[in-house]
Amino acid sequence: YIALTNKIIIADVKNSYTRIQTIAHECLHSVQDRKILLFNFIFSNIYIIYFIVSIILALINKIQDKMLFLTIMIFLSYIYYFVRSYLENDAMIKAKYVAEEYMKEAKILSEEEIENIVNSYNKLNNIGIKTVNFQLMMETAIKTIILAIVLLI
């Protein structure tokens, strides 16, 4: 989901049992609080720019207070992580219910088939939510570590 244009772009998942849940997930992003989505978009870009500019300034030895730059990076990383994880967790948790409701209303599968798919969604979400949170945490930690190393040079 692209917040600025209010458009959903989905990979080719036609032959996947996760198709309905994936569509539901992206649709849920489109109805999340617009202010949070726009904040996430703007803040994510500021976060990336801060990281790149800090690296460049550190490499050309233009940073006087290295601890201040690193502390700001840690602070920005926390904000980035909490906003992104909130948006992703919210969409991942709710997508299962939206997908299940759609399959029941559309009557495209039997109750047993729907139950099997929903059970698969539960397994997928159990792993997926943890994985997304881990990935976001690692992404912020790695950026912070890279900046710390460059600041030491």
Predicted regions and their residues:
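Post-HEXXH active-site segment of zinc metalloproteases
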Residues: 33-63
